[in-house]
Amino acid sequence: MDTAAVDRIIEKLIEVRSSNPGKLVQLSESEIKQLCVASRDIFLKQPNLLESEAPIKTRGDIHGQYSDLLRLFEYGGFPPEANYLFLGDYVDRGRQSLETICLLLAYKIKYPENFFLLRGNHECASINRIYGFYDECKRRFNVKLWKSFTDCFNCLPVAALIDEKILCMHGGLSPDLSSLDQIRNLPRPTAIPDTGLLCDLQRSDPGKDVKGWGMNDRGVSYTFGPDKVSEFLSKHDLDLVCRAHQVVEDGYEFFAESELVTIFSAPNYCGEFDNAGAMMSVDENLLCSFQILKPAEKKNKFVM
C-alpha cells in the first residue's frame, strides 16, 4: 500500500477532530480492504510476542469510542510524536468501531516499528459478530468487509514485552503459560479458542480474593490471585504485568502490590459507567506514569 494512500486515509480520519464528536468518516470499501491486507502482512512479519522499547505509551480498551481515541492522541501526541502500544478491544459497543480500527491500522502501516496493536478478545469473529462490529460493517458497507477484518484480526500479535521487563497482554496470565516461547510459538492466523493459552491471554482476570487459580464469572478462562502474579514475575525476571479487559473507575488500577496494572482507555464506557480513561507512559528508565481522561460529563478534563 503506497504511502500517499495511507496519508490520505489518516488525513480524512483525523480532520473530524475539530467537528462535533460522533461525526462519521466515510472511507471507501477499497481503502478499508487495503488497510486490512497491508496491516495483516505486517502483523505476520512481526512476532506474536512483540519486543518493544521504552519510551512508549500504553492504552487499554477503546471499544469504538472514536472521539475519545482522538482526544487521547491530542494529549499523548499523534504518531510519530510518541510510540504507542494498544492492548486490544478496538471494536464493538461504541458507535464508531470502523473509524477507530481504520485509524489504528493506518498508523500501524505508516509506523510499523513505533506503533503496536495487540489482539483483544473482541478482535474475534465469534465475539464481534454479536456485540456491534458486524452490524456496523453491514449497515455502512457489507458482510464481506467484516470478513476482511476477521482475516486481519486473526493475525494480530497477542502480547508484548517492553524492554524485557514489562509483559503486556489484553487479558491476563494462564495456568498453561510456563515459558514466554509458548506465546512466540502460538499459530497465526487463528480464531480465539474457548480454552487454553491463547484464550487465557485474552480473557483471564486478576481476583483480589483468589489464591492460585479460580473460576471466572465470565464463564470462560480463569481468575488468578496475587500469588500467581508474584510467582510469574519472579520466574521470568519481570517487573510488571500490564493488561486491560476490565472497566476500572480511575482508568487504571494496580493489583498484587503494584505487580500488575489494569488500563482501560474508554471514558464513560458505553455511556453507562462513570469511569475515567487512562494511558500509561513508560519512560526510558521504565518508570510508569498515568494520564487520566475524565468522563464526558466532567468536561473531559485531562490531568496528570
UniProtKB/Swiss-Prot annotation:
This is Serine/threonine-protein phosphatase PP1 isozyme 3. It is an enzyme of class 3 (hydrolase). It comes from the Eukaryota. It comes from Nicotiana tabacum. Keywords: Hydrolase, Manganese, Metal-binding, Protein phosphatase. Gene3D superfamilies: 3.60.21.10. Mn(2+) 2 binds at D89, N121, H170, H245. Its cofactor is Mn(2+). One of its GO terms (molecular function) is metal ion binding. Binds 2 manganese ions per subunit. The active site is at H122 (proton donor). One of its GO terms (cellular component) is nucleus. The lineage of its organism: Eukaryota, Viridiplantae, Streptophyta, Embryophyta, Tracheophyta. It catalyses: O-phospho-L-seryl-[protein] + H2O = L-seryl-[protein] + phosphate; O-phospho-L-threonyl-[protein] + H2O = L-threonyl-[protein] + phosphate. Mn(2+) 1 binds at D61, H63, D89. Belongs to the PPP phosphatase family. PP-1 subfamily. Its EC number is 3.1.3.16. Pfam families: Metallophos, STPPase_N.
